[in-house]
Structures are given as C-alpha cells and as structure tokens.
Amino acid sequence: MMRLGPIVALGAVLASATVAQAERIVEASYGEPTSRYQHGVFGETSEWGALKLVVDRCAGCASPDLHRIVLRLPETHVFEDIVPRLVDLDGDGEPEVVVVETDMAQGARLSVYGPTGLITATPYIGQTRRWLAPAGFGDFNDDGLLDIAYVETPHLGKVLRIFTLRTTPSPHLEELGRVAGITNHRIGDSNIWGGVRVCQGRAEVIGADGNWSRMMVARLQGGELVLSDVGPLSSPAQLDAALRC
C-alpha cells in the first residue's frame, strides 16, 4: 500500500542525516522548477527547487511501506542537474542520492542525500554561476566501494575531481585526486557526455580536451589522476560510444 509521507522543507534538514538501515530509497526525481537562478547550463531557463523521493521504510519486508518525501531547498539554492543518481557509495546495500546542488551566491557543490536529508557534500565552488558536471561512478582506488567523478567548471577550469564517501568519524567526502584538462559538457548542451567505464577491471573517465578535438582518458594510478590523449574527437557522441570497452 502506498502511503503519502511528509513534505519536508530542506532548510530544516541541512545537517547530516543518519539513514535507518530498514529504509531504502527506491526512486528519486527533481521537482518544483524555478526561475530564481537562471544559469541555464543546459540551455533552459529554470532549475529545480526540490528533490522528490520514494522511500521504502520497511526494506526487506514481504510488503513494501512506500512513502513519498519532498526535500525542498531554501530560496537561495537550486538543483542544477539533469537527473538525481541513485548509487550505493558506502557499501551497505542501500543507495544514496547524488545531486548537483547550487548556492546562488557560491556556485555548485556535489551533494549526497539520504531519505531524511543531506548526508554530506563537497565545498561549494565559491563563486556564483560556477557549476560542476557529474561524470559517473567507479571503484578508482580498488577498495571495493564506488567513488564519484565529476568535472568542476567544465566550461572554464575543466578540472576532473574524484571523491569517495567516508563514514567515520562522521560522513564526509574525501578527495582521491584531481587533474586539469578534461571536460564533459558544453554550455547549452542538454547532455553530459562521456562518463566512467570499467575495462579489464580498471575504472577510468572518458571525456574531451578543452577544445573538444581530442578524446581523453583519466585513471587513478599510484594515488594520482593521470590523463591520456587517446585520439581525435569529431563528435561528442564518440565519448558515449567509447564507454563500451
């Protein structure tokens, strides 16, 4: 039976949340489009004001106990993203939600949410109208957990950064590496190109150079992100095709 859960204002839950083991996020989407920011990185004139979740509060039970929850941002924030991403970052078998959240004065950050609100996040970039483009998830440091890859300021600085979620002493995102010279988005495009592939057991990020003329691959080697030029790039669609080993 579907029961409607509470509508939650995010300003009340910006502190780190502890996710109950019995709860599972089964669906996530953005809602409440807003024109209060209008950065328009995807060519649109609106971003999102809320994160909508469907949460099973009795995961593993014979019958699901589904609740709809809305995590609503303060008026000074928007979600500046295409779609929320459900992924298990801490290896507990339950997914977290990974999103791009923007403070209108400080730019974007990569945020991780649970059923009741924010778990942790990277720092904001630090300047208005500065954005980051998620690249994907992979086990870059071979510890058995999925890490997060994104390109910070893909239209300007073009810096790939990789983070992993640590749960002790409290949840936080630890940076594993960064490298400049790779991007995955062009201003106005509705798609984020390329992503993470795993070939021969090794996670690597596929993207473009700053001129969109060369295909680039980034791997974590010896604790450092290493960038390689792997050939000419004539179309952004090549980056998506390259995700197939």
Where in the sequence are the language-model features?
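N-terminal secretory signal peptides that target proteins for export/translocation
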Residues: 1-3
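Beta-propeller-forming repeat regions
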Residues: 20-245
